[in-house]
């Protein structure tokens, strides 16, 4: 027998039962926006998290191989962009429900590192700028890459 039925059996007066049911309904209404937020968030966040786990494992393999022009490197590049898109969607859901948005993503870092190791410095700088626009502190990496290119920061 459920908890609700046990509680209802201990309430003896009809007024008490009515009041209890009203209170329960009020609490359910209070929880409704949070439950909607959780449902909408997890549809996107679960995909983001699964993809980030894949990227981390593949990055380890790529890092050990040092072959940043391999098929795996291009697969990771594609997955980083996909993860960044999920990251943006997670932030949108957070903001829609008045929650503090997710503060950063390693997908930006991995993508910037990948471009840097491929010698694609301007692309790496662009990724760092995008990360900064989401509140991540990628300025040191960006300035280091800009020095490699030999140009002034813009």
Which residue stretches match the model-derived regions?
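Long, contiguous interaction/recruitment modules in multidomain scaffold/adaptor proteins
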Residues: 1-43
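Alpha-helical junction/boundary sensor with strong preference for TPR arrays
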Residues: 80-94, 131-136
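Active-site or metal-binding loop neighborhoods of secreted/extracellular toxin and effector enzymes
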Residues: 131, 140-142, 153-154
């Amino acid at each position: 027998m459920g908890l609700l039925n046990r509680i209802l059996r201990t309430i003896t007066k009809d007024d008490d039962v009515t009041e209890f049911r009203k209170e329960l309904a009020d609490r359910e209404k209070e929880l409704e926006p949070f439950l909607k937020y959780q449902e909408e968030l997890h549809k996107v966040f679960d995909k983001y998290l699964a993809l980030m786990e894949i990227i981390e494992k593949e990055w380890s393999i790529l890092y050990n191989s040092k072959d940043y022009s391999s098929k795996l490197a291009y697969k990771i590049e594609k997955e980083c962009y996909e993860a960044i898109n999920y990251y943006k969607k997670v932030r949108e859901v957070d903001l829609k429900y008045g929650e503090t948005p997710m503060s950063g993503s390693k997908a930006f870092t991995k993508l910037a590192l990948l471009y840097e190791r491929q010698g694609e410095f301007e692309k790496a700088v662009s990724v760092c700028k995008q990360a900064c626009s989401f509140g991540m502190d990628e300025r040191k990496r960006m300035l280091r890459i800009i020095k490699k290119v030999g140009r002034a920061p813009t």
